[in-house]
Amino acid sequence: MKKPYRKISDYAIVGGLSALVMVSIVGCKSNADDKPKEQSSLSQSVQKGAFVILEEQKDKSYKVVEEYPSSRTHIVVRDLQGNERVLSNEEIQKLIKEEEAKIDNGTSKLVQPNNGGSNEGSGFGLGSAILGSAAGAILGSYIGNKLFNNPNYQQNAQRTYKSPQAYQRSQNSFSKSAPSASSMGTASKGQSGFFGSSRPTSSPAISSGTRGFNA
């Protein structure tokens, strides 16, 4: 019986609640090892969900610091003091709806020009950070067409990540899980973010919680 390659030590860079969530993900994958069909296609986890850590910045904006494919969608928010909590399904849907309204009226920072290229004073709120991440491509797939062909979104999506290294780790993680670039559209997107026509049209299961922990 094959064992999952991702060990808990792989996630040493994520702390507190995010590490506990990863333990549950690894446990679920261990049980799934007895099902060859499920184990044979890691792309299923990409389609089902993503584990995302959003970190609050000094200007009260948020950045993606880590994200991985997972069987369920988990969005962990880490504040300036290092406290973490998992957003509930209701919170996530509310944030996405609010951001969709901003996209429609052109006030979302995801669709605005990046003047000067400076992050100072132009950070992303929770809603835009979620939609700029892989989780947003899944949870907000029904509004993907409003963003995918927008050149400003294509430039801004990468800016939702804390660093180029964080963005590249995410790209590598999801492209390794995809069976091919043509079927999942992950490896070929480059700086275009994660939205694509191959994404599912309904939201996957979301694991949520509200307790705060210290990182």
From Swiss-Prot:
Residues 170-183, 197-208 have a biased composition (Low complexity). A lipid is attached at C28 (S-diacylglycerol cysteine). Residues 158-215 are annotated as: Disordered. Residues 1-27 form the signal peptide. Keywords: Cell membrane, Lipoprotein, Membrane, Palmitate, Signal. It is found in: Cell membrane. GO terms for cellular component: plasma membrane. The keyword Cell membrane applies. Belongs to the UPF0323 family. This is UPF0323 lipoprotein jhp_0217. It comes from Helicobacter pylori (strain J99 / ATCC 700824).
